[in-house]
Amino acid sequence: MRAYLDLVQHVLEHGHRKEDRTGTGTLSVFGHQMRFDLEAGFPLVTTKRVFWRGVAEELLWFIRGSTNARELEDKGVRIWSPWADPDGELGPVYGAQWRSWRAADGREIDQLQQVLTELRQRPDSRRHLVSAWNVGELERMNLPPCHLLFQFYVAEGRLSCQLYQRSADLFLGVPFNIASYSLLTHLVARHVGLEVGEFIWTGGDCHLYLNHLAQAREQLSRAPRPLPTLHIDPGVTDLFAVRYEHLRLAGYDPHPKLTAPVAV
């Protein structure tokens, strides 16, 4: 995960001071890319403990098409709770857009299922994309998507994925996002009968909140440890049947967790 730590260091040294929606303030740079070879280990940050169950449960929640935070809360995951209404609803956020994008003619489009079908039938297509940035529904979302577009690519029997993240909270969010879309790549590859290739993360506004700087510096003082290995229950190949209990990380030995406030 040296690429991630190098980006944190770069923002600390060269980031522009900017104001933001939350009133917290950030150090920010614009435009950055990181690449992770998924055969070389599962890219989960080791310089602090990352909430693995939260990563996995959130992704499976997206895949189910859910938009209610109570489903996550029932599993001990509260990362979406600050933005939920009293009933737990978040509006048409990620899950709704992935699984039931509302078209202008009233149809609901299952983008994720379309991509799975196309990966099998036309693996060399350049249209293996899923977007969560539905301009017509942004105002109804309690939090517009930060990681808003991902694309799959097949070469030599391997599946790679690139994510575009318009807004990248480097200390709290990005370690989660890297792990989430790396897990998605593994699960989709298994569903369509491919091996894994790379996960490529592309960020727009890459920032550290001003009240995360001390924690970021502490993280940089820690030596990275070997990456864990992801194991998926061999009896489960259907993406839509995967549950947290089917996933296991072997060899995850991170440094202690570092806490920081969430900018809401």
Swiss-Prot record:
<comment type="similarity">
    <text>Belongs to the thymidylate synthase family. Bacterial-type ThyA subfamily.</text>
</comment>
<feature type="active site" description="Nucleophile">
    <location>
        <position position="146"/>
    </location>
</feature>
<keyword id="KW-0545">Nucleotide biosynthesis</keyword>
<feature type="binding site" description="in other chain">
    <location>
        <begin position="207"/>
        <end position="209"/>
    </location>
    <ligand>
        <name>dUMP</name>
    </ligand>
</feature>
<protein>
    <recommendedName>
        <fullName>Thymidylate synthase</fullName>
        <ecNumber>2.1.1.45</ecNumber>
    </recommendedName>
</protein>
<dbReference type="InterPro" id="IPR000398">
    <property type="entry name" value="Thymidylate_synthase"/>
</dbReference>
<dbReference type="InterPro" id="IPR036926">
    <property type="entry name" value="Thymidate_synth/dCMP_Mease_sf"/>
</dbReference>
<dbReference type="GO" id="GO:0006235">
    <property type="term" value="P:dTTP biosynthetic process"/>
</dbReference>
<dbReference type="InterPro" id="IPR020940">
    <property type="entry name" value="Thymidylate_synthase_AS"/>
</dbReference>
<comment type="subunit">
    <text>Homodimer.</text>
</comment>
<feature type="binding site" description="in other chain">
    <location>
        <position position="21"/>
    </location>
    <ligand>
        <name>dUMP</name>
    </ligand>
</feature>
<dbReference type="InterPro" id="IPR023451">
    <property type="entry name" value="Thymidate_synth/dCMP_Mease_dom"/>
</dbReference>
<feature type="binding site">
    <location>
        <position position="169"/>
    </location>
    <ligand>
        <name>(6R)-5,10-methylene-5,6,7,8-tetrahydrofolate</name>
    </ligand>
</feature>
<dbReference type="InterPro" id="IPR045097">
    <property type="entry name" value="Thymidate_synth/dCMP_Mease"/>
</dbReference>
<keyword id="KW-0489">Methyltransferase</keyword>
<dbReference type="GO" id="GO:0032259">
    <property type="term" value="P:methylation"/>
</dbReference>
<feature type="binding site">
    <location>
        <begin position="126"/>
        <end position="127"/>
    </location>
    <ligand>
        <name>dUMP</name>
    </ligand>
</feature>
<dbReference type="GO" id="GO:0004799">
    <property type="term" value="F:thymidylate synthase activity"/>
</dbReference>
<feature type="binding site" description="in other chain">
    <location>
        <position position="177"/>
    </location>
    <ligand>
        <name>dUMP</name>
    </ligand>
</feature>
<feature type="binding site">
    <location>
        <position position="263"/>
    </location>
    <ligand>
        <name>(6R)-5,10-methylene-5,6,7,8-tetrahydrofolate</name>
    </ligand>
</feature>
<keyword id="KW-0963">Cytoplasm</keyword>
<comment type="function">
    <text>Catalyzes the reductive methylation of 2'-deoxyuridine-5'-monophosphate (dUMP) to 2'-deoxythymidine-5'-monophosphate (dTMP) while utilizing 5,10-methylenetetrahydrofolate (mTHF) as the methyl donor and reductant in the reaction, yielding dihydrofolate (DHF) as a by-product. This enzymatic reaction provides an intracellular de novo source of dTMP, an essential precursor for DNA biosynthesis.</text>
</comment>
<comment type="pathway">
    <text>Pyrimidine metabolism; dTTP biosynthesis.</text>
</comment>
<dbReference type="GO" id="GO:0006231">
    <property type="term" value="P:dTMP biosynthetic process"/>
</dbReference>
<dbReference type="Pfam" id="PF00303">
    <property type="entry name" value="Thymidylat_synt"/>
</dbReference>
<feature type="binding site" description="in other chain">
    <location>
        <begin position="166"/>
        <end position="169"/>
    </location>
    <ligand>
        <name>dUMP</name>
    </ligand>
</feature>
<keyword id="KW-0808">Transferase</keyword>
<dbReference type="GO" id="GO:0005829">
    <property type="term" value="C:cytosol"/>
</dbReference>
